[in-house]
């Protein structure tokens, strides 16, 4: 078919060179370097050397920077991420630090609560030397005021992500960031103490590109109402912020909102606020966690109008204001639902049967802390949820019969987590191995025995995310260093305690499931 006659392949020049220079043939004396001190990296381009550095850990990169002046220069010019222990004593060293690291685009400044942080003057120097910053984190920088934030914003106009925690500046500093950083996309504020009662409202310019807002443990956080109501915003997450938030969500407009994700946790919001959220016709993800004033009526108003809802998390906090009535509305209107988490919600056979029958795209389901869910309800799910892939059940009145029903039904089920269900015995594990060899199962004794998941499952499903991070030290692309062994031990303790917390376990499980699916789809 027109092919040339076969002939012996010519040796590859690259393979030949590698063979000639391999360690077993290399002899420094034969090539004229009797002392053996020849630098074989001298002929490597700087870009190639920098690429090699990217595969090293933070500690190895620091040690490599001491090898030669060239390595020091290459390492400094190619570190784009830097984390500093932002104590006040760092001020005289800032010029030297940024002379070496002159290409930083992601900067973290962290100070522990027992020390004085860097001041407005130091932050101004940082903004002058790192004008190309796109991501900044401020943690515990209590000496920075509104004036410091304003000067920083004027010099760092390319900033895209800003995260501040345990700082004392107020609304003026935040407004300055929003005014000068026109391309800011993500704003995260935690424990900002400068938002007093007379604080000026947060203003967003018409040309702003803000896409995500995260507010946590704020006093008078309602001053951010204009941000929540802006039409460009995609994601809102509000956790443990004081005051009533109904008015904020009422400002969402008449269906012109672009919000696709809303997460509310331990917040004073009622059905009035949910009525406002229902105006977000593009909403795809809704988390209602420990909001005791929300009822079936508010939930029904959201699901009736938000036809694109794909992920729904409800933590009823055992106040029993959300039950079958609200879940029946979910079954009727949320036909695109893919992920459902019910914690402390007394769902019955009627509502679960309706959800299993109508929500044909449901892939991830978690039922926790309910006294009304037994073998009959699980059997109904097993029979009707033909697309279910991952299922987590915790603290419910099911037995081996319900677990066996899941194995016999749900043909696409790949992961099953059963926790704190006292009527489920270990014998069902062996039964599952025989019937569903590919099914990944996690049960109570997996943690006590130190075993991850049955049949070689993914250990990441059992991991718990620790919110509080230990303060890091100077670091590079290899990751953020950690300073202070005491806080590291506290983080480990929180991780262990997190494995015993049902709600955190379920939230982590669903988060890992979603991430693994996103990775596999790519």
Swiss-Prot record:
The keyword Repeat applies. Signal peptide: none annotated. Residues 38-84 form the F-box domain. SMART domains: FBOX, LRR_CC. It comes from the Eukaryota. LRR repeats lie at residues 115-140, 141-166, 169-191, 266-290, 291-316, 319-344, 348-369, 370-393, 395-420, 421-447. One of its GO terms (cellular component) is cytoplasm. Keywords: Leucine-rich repeat, Repeat. GO terms for molecular function: ubiquitin-protein transferase activity. Gene3D superfamilies: 1.20.1280.50, Ribonuclease Inhibitor. Pfam families: F-box, LRR_At5g56370. CDD domains: F-box_AtTIR1-like. PANTHER family: F-BOX_LRR-REPEAT PROTEIN 16, PARTNER OF PAIRED, ISOFORM B-RELATED. This is F-box/LRR-repeat protein 16. It comes from Arabidopsis thaliana. The gene is FBL16.
